[in-house]
Amino acid sequence: MTDRSDSCTLHLDVSGRVQGVGYREALRAEALRLGVRGWVRNRYDGSVEAVIQGPRAAVERLVVWARRGPPAARVTQLEARPDCGGFDRPYAGFERLPSA
């Protein structure tokens, strides 16, 4: 069982050249590698949105990765809105959601 006091949930908005470059799948793969749960999806405005949840250190490592993204991506802005300490909706895995 995960220690919820060490868990963190962040909502990410990522802008730049992040669609059509494998960003979502690469984020999902990195999240799974780090043991982070949540979801990722494209936005109609050209950005990518994600909710990431897991041990604080793993979530922080994923945010560092997300600021770079995969090789073909060019991240110009990443906004992370913390929801640390709250575990309103625990995620079981990491999903790719339809665009919104």
State where each predicted segment sits.
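Intrinsically disordered, low-complexity, mixed-charge
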Residues: 1-100
